Amino acid sequence: MTLITLIINPLMYIIPILLAMAFLTLVERKMLGYMQLRKGPNIVGPYGLLQPIADGVKLFIKEPVKPSTSSPTLFLLTPTLALTLALILWIPLPMPLALTDLNLTILFILAVSSLSVYSILGSGWASNSKYALIGALRAVAQTISYEVTLGLIIISLIMFTGGFTLTTFNTAQEAVWLILPAWPLAAMWFISTLAETNRAPFDLTEGESELVSGFNVEYAGGPFALFFLAEYTNILLMNALSTILFLGPSFNTLTINLNWAIKTMILASMFLWVRASYPRFRYDQLMHLVWKNFLPLTLALITWHISLPISMAGSPPQL
């Protein structure tokens, strides 16, 4: 492999993701606009289509202001880490072919997504601001809590499919989508992904009325744009993963890419719809939901999915 190939391959993967993420921000602003009986962005370019590009250019040409009391290295390192991790997570996704087909894809995704906690905590601490630190601590507690349920839901799904690779999910769902037999898991998964990506109604980390802007309050210009890119890249990733886990592939192999993309965009628009419809949770309600409702239910379902095949083993097939 030549040096050019080594550079072009990742770029061919990264640029479409970043473009999709940029236009997701436009879709969000348009959708929220129409839900609030207004137009949304419509000045920059035809129908406001160039708005994300204008926003990106505007942010990156602004001066990156650093607080005088902040930790300079960590302050600039954490946004870079956030975006890097968000893009690394796309590598093993079968769309329908992965850039790198790993044997333990799901374990890799769980491991890398849990590392994003460090970028949030680091940014809150390095800012040397009480609002940023409180926002970061909230974000970390929320992310770690909901990762527990995401992990348990995935364990249940692995029992259905019989493998840790995402390609086995495609094979297992040829007959029926997993959203039908495992709809309680799908509902909990969707709500947990909302919380994991810090989206409304779980956007307690950036509660403007309490914390100004959360852990990224001291960031401006380029570093702020990197956090913004990471957040929306993670939203798209979670919806792409939800599509692979619960909504299966297309039966028509010619349109498998288009089919996957349409399902992902429908789920992403549901994320935006939820933001327009629901008020923010109180912090204790957020924690009660995961530790007192989701955790017992997911553990019960895991027990059920383990015990059912064992108890039915040896019984004649007609039963």
UniProtKB/Swiss-Prot annotation:
Organism: Polypterus ornatipinnis (Ornate bichir)
EC number: 7.1.1.2
Function: Core subunit of the mitochondrial membrane respiratory chain NADH dehydrogenase (Complex I) that is believed to belong to the minimal assembly required for catalysis. Complex I functions in the transfer of electrons from NADH to the respiratory chain. The immediate electron acceptor for the enzyme is believed to be ubiquinone.
Reactions this protein catalyses: a ubiquinone + NADH + 5 H(+)(in) = a ubiquinol + NAD(+) + 4 H(+)(out)
Pfam families in alphabetical order: NADHdh
InterPro entries membership: NADH_UbQ_OxRdtase_su1/FPO (IPR001694), NADH_UbQ_OxRdtase_su1_CS (IPR018086)
Any one of the GO CC terms: mitochondrial inner membrane
GO biological-process terms attached to the record: aerobic respiration
Bilayer topology term: Multi-pass membrane protein
UniProt similarity note: Belongs to the complex I subunit 1 family.
Transmembrane segments: 3-23, 74-94, 106-126, 149-169, 175-195, 226-246, 254-274, 294-314
HAMAP family: NDH1_NuoH (MF_01350)
GO molecular function: NADH dehydrogenase (ubiquinone) activity
Compartment(s) of residence: Mitochondrion inner membrane
Key words of the record: Electron transport, Membrane, Mitochondrion, Mitochondrion inner membrane, NAD, Respiratory chain, Translocase, Transmembrane, Transmembrane helix, Transport, Ubiquinone
Signal sequence segment: none
Protein name (Swiss-Prot/TrEMBL): NADH-ubiquinone oxidoreductase chain 1
